């Protein structure tokens, strides 16, 4: 039987647990999550265990990154199952604050980041998202003071924004991106996949197939607009409403015009039924 991790729900409890860890000169890796854990999250945990002596997983459904019309109230919350999975992975500490702990009465601060990584992708469709993400991640870094922090590459724009923020603000954590975990048919693992109807679940892997096809055409020498146009046709033909399909510089996320502009990342967001999915691939 797996030993349950220590669970901290208040800042004093978190600090006591971390003081014990730090007294042993142990390195700490943080895996920030919103719960509803799946194999993609557990891959982050396993890599964290290889990088650091102790692993902290935060579980906090962050209201600040949801718009009023989004799924904050219905977002999957599976605490007992999450804790069992983390116990099986031998996680050391789970940080599970509530909203009043993270955003107490009178809270009025926000971390705002700028630069090309923030422009023209998710921000166009979820304008308050990154202000909520950077603020909560900044708070988590201040609370846990990790040596390493692990984020999945599925949320690639988020990964680049958080990496830049940690570097610019000297937050002390080395941000590590971890390749996207996928279902057997290629669909990127996501807590929101549970929203998909059987019909939409069958169509969902088209998103990844379209990215792979566009990347293949780019490597074969196709013009970027032609390759992306073909990918967009595949996506809409499968029943998706496309938000964006773009080629960006893989490090800065600046828009690019040709393969010569640097390493390329293709990023897509699209909606099928009521579910919005994102994905990305390297070229």
From Swiss-Prot:
It catalyses: (R)-pantoate + beta-alanine + ATP = (R)-pantothenate + AMP + diphosphate + H(+). ATP binds at residues 34-41, 152-155, 189-192. Coiled coil: none annotated. Keywords: ATP-binding, Cytoplasm, Ligase, Nucleotide-binding, Pantothenate biosynthesis. Its EC number is 6.3.2.1. Its main location: cytoplasm. (R)-pantoate binds at residues 65, 158. It is an enzyme of class 6 (ligase). GO terms for cellular component: cytosol. Beta-alanine binds at residue 65. It is found in: Cytoplasm. The active site is at residue 41. One of its GO terms (biological process) is pantothenate biosynthetic process. It comes from the Bacteria. GO terms for molecular function: ATP binding; pantoate-beta-alanine ligase activity. Pathway: Cofactor biosynthesis; (R)-pantothenate biosynthesis; (R)-pantothenate from (R)-pantoate and beta-alanine: step 1/1. NCBIfam families: panC (TIGR00018). Homodimer. Catalyzes the condensation of pantoate with beta-alanine in an ATP-dependent reaction via a pantoyl-adenylate intermediate. The reaction proceeds by a bi uni uni bi ping pong mechanism. Belongs to the pantothenate synthetase family. This is Pantothenate synthetase.
């Amino acid at each position: 039987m797996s030993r349950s991790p220590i669970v901290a729900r208040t800042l004093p409890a978190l600090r006591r647990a971390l003081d014990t860890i730090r007294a042993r000169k142990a390195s700490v890796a943080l895996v920030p999550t919103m719960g509803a854990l799946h194999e993609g999250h557990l891959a982050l945990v396993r890599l964290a265990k290889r990088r650091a002596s102790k692993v902290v997983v935060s579980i906090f459904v962050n209201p600040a990154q949801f718009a009023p019309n989004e799924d904050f109230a219905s977002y999957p919350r599976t605490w007992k199952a999450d804790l069992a999975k983390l116990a099986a992975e031998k996680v050391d500490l789970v940080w599970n604050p509530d909203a009043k702990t993270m955003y107490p009465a009178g809270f009025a601060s926000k971390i705002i980041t700028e630069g090309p990584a923030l422009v023209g992708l998710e921000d166009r469709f979820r304008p308050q998202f990154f202000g909520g993400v950077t603020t909560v991640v900044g708070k988590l870094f201040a609370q846990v003071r990790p040596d390493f922090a692990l984020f999945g590459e599925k949320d690639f724009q988020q990964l680049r924004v958080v990496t830049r923020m940690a570097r610019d603000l000297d937050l002390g954590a080395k941000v590590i991106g971890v390749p996207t975990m996928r279902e057997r048919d290629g669909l990127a693992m996501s807590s929101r996949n549970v929203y998909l109807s059987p019909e939409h679940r069958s169509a969902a892997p088209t998103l990844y197939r379209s990215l792979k096809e566009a990347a293949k055409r780019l490597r074969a020498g196709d013009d970027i607009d032609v390759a992306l146009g073909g990918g967009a046709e595949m996506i809409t033909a499968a029943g998706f409403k496309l938000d964006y399909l773009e080629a960006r510089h893989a490090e800065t996320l600046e828009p690019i015009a040709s393969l010569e502009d640097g390493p390329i990342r293709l990023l897509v967001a699209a909606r099928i039924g009521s579910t919005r999915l994102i994905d990305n691939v390297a070229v």
